[in-house]
């Protein structure tokens, strides 16, 4: 953002992003100030990615909005507002159904011998056991690293072990998140997963 030149003619900015909104007021205010420096308007709102998803999926309607991407999240929304949110808890404690959870379970299954694709997986990513452990425990953004294995999962979805991994992850998302909302409401999802 700092490298962008100022932009004229913009009357308002609505930004929806992960790590923004009411839950993260300091980060939201910092981003709002940075946006204000590039757009000649003070009509700038910074909100959560979940609120953006809810508004995109349901507008002024009512339903359950879900994000399945690097992480996962869900909410009950009505009239463009979030009424209830089951906390996602991040990739270590939650994020069921997310790319990070799928990647974590893939690596676990491969190295514990439950998924018979070890050599193909390591060759496809130019990795070894030590490198994976280093990237997960000693470098930032382990969630993104784990989520980067989602295309491998997609490419091998016909493998019974991979198919079961995916189904189990989505069942976990439903049982730990969707089950906390009224069952009669419709559910919509978006995201890279």
Where does each model-flagged region fall?
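A glycine- and small-aliphatic-rich helix-loop capping segment at beta-alpha/alpha-beta transitions
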Residues: 30-38, 60-64, 79-84
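Short loop/edge segments at beta-strand edges and connector loops
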Residues: 46-48
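Short glycine-rich anion-binding loops that position phosphate/pyrophosphate groups of nucleotides
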Residues: 18-21, 70-73
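Metabolite-binding pocket within alpha/beta catalytic cores that recognizes anionic/polar moieties
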Residues: 52
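Metal-dependent catalytic neighborhoods of phosphoester/phosphodiester hydrolases
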Residues: 22-30
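Glycine-rich phosphate-binding loop plus the immediately following alpha-helix
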Residues: 82-126
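Short beta-strand scaffold segments in enzyme catalytic cores
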Residues: 55, 66, 72-77
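ATP-binding/phosphotransfer module of carbohydrate and carboxylate kinases, centering on a glycine-rich
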Residues: 1-14, 37, 42, 57-64, ...
């Amino acid at each position: 953002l700092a490298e962008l030149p100022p932009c004229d003619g913009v009357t308002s900015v609505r930004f929806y992003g992960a790590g923004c909104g009411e839950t993260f007021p300091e980060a939201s205010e910092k981003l709002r100030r940075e946006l204000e420096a590039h757009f000649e308007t003070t009509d700038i709102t910074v909100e959560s990615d979940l609120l953006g998803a809810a508004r995109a999926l349901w507008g002024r309607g009512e339903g359950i909005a879900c994000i399945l991407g690097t992480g996962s999240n869900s909410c009950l929304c009505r009239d463009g507002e979030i009424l209830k949110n089951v906390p996602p808890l991040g990739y270590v404690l939650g994020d069921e159904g997310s790319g990070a959870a799928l990647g974590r379970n893939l690596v676990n299954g491969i190295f514990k011998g439950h998924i018979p694709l070890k050599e193909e997986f390591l060759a496809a990513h130019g990795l070894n056991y030590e490198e994976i452990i280093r990237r997960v425990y000693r470098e930032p953004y382990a969630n993104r690293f784990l989520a980067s294995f989602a295309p491998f999962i997609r490419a091998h979805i016909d493998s019974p072990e991979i198919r079961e991994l995916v189904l189990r992850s989505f069942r976990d998302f439903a049982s730990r998140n969707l089950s906390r909302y009224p069952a009669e409401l419709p559910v919509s999802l978006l995201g890279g997963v």
